[in-house]
Amino acid sequence: MSKLVLVLNCGSSSLKFAVVDAQSGEQHLSGLAECLHLPEARIKWKLDGKHEAQLGEGAAHDEALSFIVETILASKPELAAQLKAIGHRVVHGGEQFTQSALIDDAVLKGIEDCAALAPLHNPAHIIGIKAAQKAFPELKNVAVFDTAFHQTMPEEAYLYALPYNLYKEHGIRRYGMHGTSHLFIAREAAERLGKPANELNIINCHLGNGASVCAIKNGQSVDTSMGLTPLEGLVMGTRCGDIDPAIIFHLHDTLGYSVEKINTMLTKESGLLGLTEVTSDCRFVEDNYGQKEEATRAMDVFCHRLAKYVAGYTASLDGRLDAITFTGGIGENSAPIREMVLNRLAIFGITVDSAANLKARFGGEGVITTADSRIPAMVIATNEELVIAEDTARLTNI
């Protein structure tokens, strides 16, 4: 008997959705509503072929979910009839949620309480949850938290060197994100390396418009690059990642930037976009490397930052690193970035197999280092939707 779960991932201006069989892993439907709240709001989906439609000017999450229910699922009533539960990706669960949770009023309030830590994401998740409850009143909803996987980090990894009362009273600490993806990759890597998951040591690089690195020791997160919020760490599409905090005071006190302008700049105008002054698209950076100064500059900074994190995280693994893994839109598809990063890690005895690396794109996976490389590097496609579906099935007993 199938265990079909509707998986929802609400961003500030998007809604990613899928219908996943939690038992077989088969994806029966997938799609994305994007540009929500804007005149060009639209929805794309795969169900018996590829489809696209306009949602109407200014359409929001409610309208997108209504379209999914009344148009997409209505076109395949036998699929809609088999839905058993709904799983939601939630970016921030703070310290309150160390694992996925069946959503009730208390859980919903907890997600709302964490909104200040993920202001671009948690409010959108709440909208999605309430819209799903309205659209499917008979189905149970489960929240799967990005931060939960990282709750195994030791104190020395998650504490900031700030007055300790800021942690005790206000919960200011490193939380990390992309936990669902890091968990899936750890599981997959263990299987491919033929090791028990609880004995696996890897460093996983989840690289997309948002990006993070995670040190995984004996199958558990022991350090990760994102912090209190998704702004810390690597160079990202539009986010700055690590900077000297005093830059903020300089921008405010000396250059006269408002706090709002600084916040917008660091989250939406920095990263690859800031370095190129043209685009946040990694494909532009990759295609024009060595030809255009702005692309070369951005790619060099991106790869330097990533290699530095990977090298540093070896210190958290007690001298044993079983593999370096790449996932996410950039991690799975950018052979040049993977090669540049791994070449910077040659001190660890890593040698890239250029042919294998080129093959591991656009759905290709596998080992991308030579047989004599001391540490293997692998490309593994992430599947956060499956993890969310599995947790939802487990908590709802479907």
Curated annotation (Swiss-Prot):
One Gene Ontology term, aspect cellular component: cytosol
Family as reported in the entry's similarity comment: Belongs to the acetokinase family.
CDD domains: ASKHA_NBD_AcK_PK
The species this protein was found in: Vibrio cholerae serotype O1 (strain ATCC 39315 / El Tor Inaba N16961)
One of the GO BP terms on file: acetate metabolic process
Class in the EC hierarchy, top level: transferase
GO molecular function terms attached to this record: acetate kinase activity; ATP binding; magnesium ion binding
Protein name per the record: Acetate kinase 1
Reported function: Catalyzes the formation of acetyl phosphate from acetate and ATP. Can also catalyze the reverse reaction.
Subunit text: Homodimer.
Residues that coordinate or bind substrate: R89
Keyword terms of this UniProt record: ATP-binding, Cytoplasm, Kinase, Magnesium, Metal-binding, Nucleotide-binding, Transferase
Residues at the catalytic site: D146
Subcellular location: Cytoplasm
Swiss-Prot/TrEMBL catalytic activity: acetate + ATP = acetyl phosphate + ADP
Chain positions recorded as ATP binding sites: K16, H206, L207, G208, N209, G210, D281, C282, R283, G329, I330, G331, E332, N333
